[in-house]
Amino acid sequence: MFIFQFLLLLPPTLRCFSKFPFPQTASSLTRAFSQSTSMSINLHSHAFSGNPLLSKFPLPGNPLSPSAALEALNARISLNNTHSSPSPSFKVLPFRNGRPLASSSAGTGDSPPIWDLGWLGLDDLRGIFENSGAQLSVDLLVYLNSSSEDDAVYWAIDVSDKVPELGSNNAAGLCFVELRTLMVATDWSDLQLMGNLAIAGHAKALLEWHNFSRFCGHCGEKTVPMEAGRRKKCSNDSCKKRIYPRVDPVVIMLVIDRENDRALLAKRPMRIARLYTCLSGFTEPGESLEEAVRRETWEETGIEVGEVVYHSSQPWPVAPNSIPCQLMVGFFAYAKSLEITVDKTELEDAQWFSREDVRKALTFAKYKQAQRTAAEKVEQMCKGLEKNRSLASDLNVESADEQHASIVVPGPFAIAYHLISSWAFSDQNVVNGVECNSKNPSDL
Ligand SMILES: [Zn+2]
C-alpha cells in the first residue's frame, strides 16, 4: 500500500537556539545530535521525531501536569479572569483544516527565510474568539505538555469552523500552512525547527484523532475528552469505553540484492516524475513487522525476502489519507529471488538499481534548493502574497540534475532517504551536504 514520500531539503549550517523555548531540552538534543556523527542511528534525526514536548510528562501532583493544568485553564476560561496569576503561562497552537498557524522571518545573509510556530497566549486567543462571537471552551483545547524551564503549558486547538479572521489578517504575519510545506521548508540541521516540526506533527495527529473519534465505536454515544484531551471516553455511563490516540504501523523497506549489489526501488503512480522510493505498506492485524515486510514485497513486486533487519522508525503525521499518524518502521530486506513482477494496481514501476545509480540520485538531488523554495513560499503566504496550494504543484521536484541522475529519491525528511543513503553510502557520513546518521547494512 502506498505511503506518500516527498523529496528534498537541507543546508548544513547549524543556527543558534536563541528562540528555542526549552533551553535544557535543546541542549540535550544538541548533545544527542553531536554524539551521532558516527554511523550509529540518531533517533532524533528523523523529521517529526525528537519532539521536545514529548520527552517527559509531569507526574500527577505537579502543577504543570495535565490534570492540574486543565484545572487552571478551566478557571481562567470560565471565570474570564484576566487578572489571575500569570503562572503558568498558557501557549496555544491553533490549527485550521490540519494546518498549524505559522509565521516567517528573514534568514541571515543569503540563507532562506525561517518559519516559526504561531503560538498564541490564552488571553489573545480568548479575544479572537470573542471578536468572532465564538465560545472558547476547555474541551476544545488539547494538552501537548509543559515546560518547567519557561513555566508554560502548551496546548493545541482546532479552529477550523471558528474565528475566520485568524490567519487572514496578514498584518500580523500569521497564516495557516500545510504541515508538508513546513516539513520541506525546514532546515534539517536546525534542531529548534526540527523540534517545532515535531510539535506540530504531534498536535496535528492528536487533533485529527479527536475529530474522527467524536462517537463511541461500541455504543454510538458521544465521547468526551479525558486527561486534558490526551485520551477520550464514552459519555454513556453503561459503556464508558476508553479511547486512545491512534497510531498506524507501516513497514517501509529497502530490498537489497546482496549478490549483485543492487537495491529495489519503486515508482508510485503519482505526478512526481522520476521519483523512485522504498516499498512500504500497512501491517495487517495479527502480523509481525517482519512478516509484513515479506508479504508487501512479494505482493507488490513478486520478490521473495529472507532476512529482515530493523533500521529505525519515524512518526509520519502527514499522510494524505486522513490517518492521524503513521509510524514508519524501516527495514533492510534481503532478497531471496530477483525476478520482478510489478503489481500495476499499486506501482507504476519497480526496478533493481545499482549502487552507482543510487549514489548519483543522492549526489545530484537539489534538496537545498527545494528547501529554499518551500521556505520562501511560507514567507509569501504569511505576507498574504500566495495562497496555500498543494505541495506537489509548488515544488520543482524535477530539479534534480537529469543529465547526471536518471532518478530522484525522497529527501532527508523521509525515512526512505535514510534507508537508501545508508545502503548506497555505507562508508560515508555526509552525502550531498546531508549528514547520514544511519546504520551501515554491511555491519548488520
Ligand atoms: Zn460507548
Residue ranges and their predicted role:
Residues 277-312, 331, 336-339:
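The catalytic Nudix box helix
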Residues 2-8, 12-15, 19-22, 28-213, ...:
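Nudix hydrolase/Nudix homology domain
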